[in-house]
């Protein structure tokens, strides 16, 4: 179904990069050695340091999606989960989701548009294999 997932997280100076990364890796059931991580240092509005992590996974992506989908159903019901997926899937059939970063660090999966972990599930294009 999905060929890759790209996960993007902004980590502020007051947050623990290790805790956030560990929580995310636990959720996606991967070790740090089995994912591609790009780390970008940047600054916030008031020059405060921010780290952006971009994590790319190109194998067994459906396992991650299925785990997320199952938890979405438990939280909001199957109809609402399907409606969310439909509303957040573009014409290329990429699915865009955002999870609450603080809740994720506590082992809870919750959809959120604020201070979120952004996940983009991508399908293979017509000419890719």
List each model region and its residues.
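Short glycine-/aliphatic-rich beta-strand segments at the starts of folded cytosolic domains
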Residues: 5-9, 53, 119
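Long, hydrophobic N-terminal alpha-helical segment
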Residues: 1-35
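Mid-chain, well-packed structural core segment of small domains
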Residues: 63-98
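Glycine-rich, aromatic-bearing surface loops/beta-hairpins
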Residues: 95-129
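Beta-strand elements of well-folded, non-transmembrane domains
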Residues: 9-13, 28, 57-61, 101-103, ...
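A common structural junction motif
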Residues: 27-32, 72-77, 115-118
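Short, conserved charged micro-motifs
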Residues: 16-19, 61-68, 129
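Short, charge-patterned binding micro-sites
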Residues: 35-60
């Amino acid at each position: 179904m999905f060929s890759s997932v790209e996960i993007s997280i902004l980590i502020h100076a007051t947050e623990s990069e290790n805790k956030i990364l560990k929580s995310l890796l636990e959720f996606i059931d991967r070790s740090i050695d089995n994912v591609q991580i790009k780390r970008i240092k940047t600054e916030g509005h008031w020059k405060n340091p921010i780290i952006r992590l971009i994590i790319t996974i190109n194998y067994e992506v459906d396992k991650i999606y299925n785990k997320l989908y199952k938890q979405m159903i438990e939280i909001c019901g199957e109809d609402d989960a399907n409606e969310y997926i439909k509303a957040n899937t573009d014409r290329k059939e990429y699915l865009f989701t955002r999870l609450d970063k603080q809740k994720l660090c506590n082992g809870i999966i919750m959809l959120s548009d604020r201070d979120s972990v952004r996940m983009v599930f991508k399908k293979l294009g017509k000419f890719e294999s």
